A protein has these predicted regions:
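Mature catalytic domains of secreted/periplasmic carbohydrate-active enzymes
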Residues: 1-124
Length: 124
């Protein structure tokens, strides 16, 4: 992992690295700067740091739980506006970084329903 981290940072001293433990809560390597967690089933509690003192991060799919657009239609939203807003408020308030995955079709179009949901939540 050390060699991979060094290669990822080559040419940009400000790059930060994480190794994804998928749905797990463990850290692959001491050379990573933040914890890269995936929400697969539930909304776990999140604090600013994990047990190793590393910056917390959670990745969440807004629509397609399989991450990759596979059909002709976009997947429905997984969460109501209230659920997603509550999740973002709680986790970001605790200092946890959050990445939202939005389904993209083969033409490059983002799921319009997900974009509309983000616009509604932003207004709150």
């Amino acid at each position: 992992f050390d060699e991979i981290a060094l290669a990822a940072k080559a040419g940009n001293k400000d790059t930060i690295v994480s190794f994804n433990s998928q749905g797990g809560t463990f850290v692959y390597s001491p050379c990573q700067e933040y914890f890269s967690g995936e929400e697969l089933i539930y909304f776990p509690l999140c604090g600013r740091t994990n047990s190793q003192g590393m910056q917390m991060h959670i990745w969440l799919t807004m629509d397609n739980k399989w991450w990759v657009h596979q059909g002709k239609e976009f997947s429905p939203l997984r969460f109501s506006d209230e659920e997603l807003s509550r999740f973002l408020t709680r986790h970001r308030g605790d200092g946890c970084a959050v990445t939202l995955n939005v389904d993209v079709d083969r033409t490059g179009l983002l799921n319009p329903t997900a974009i509309e949901q983000l616009a509604r939540i932003k207004k709150k």
